[in-house]
């Protein structure tokens, strides 16, 4: 009976150790798969947009950036400003505003509005109050 119990305990300890060792690998694979899918879905949505829609989205983002430059940073945006911010560059309605490619490590990571824990679990967060990532003189996009 003692051998049977010790065998069960040894098996549980082994499985626990194996789970702890495999968790980082499985977690990285899972996140990479979902990030790749998010980038692919976003790219498809952008390809479906006509040139006029793309230009309008870019113009709205540039206008937002210009407003930040002229008004200065605000620590507590109004509800209207929050709604506007969340709608900018959100082509597929998921909160994703673009993606960043890092060729050295062959990685494409989605960029989402905000820096809440839920956002940072799935991609890169854009800090509200900084310029949107569309470029331009005097703009400074901050990603987390």
Which residue ranges define each predicted feature?
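N-terminal Sec-pathway targeting helices
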Residues: 1-14
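Solvent-exposed, non-transmembrane regions of membrane-associated and secreted proteins
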Residues: 14-144
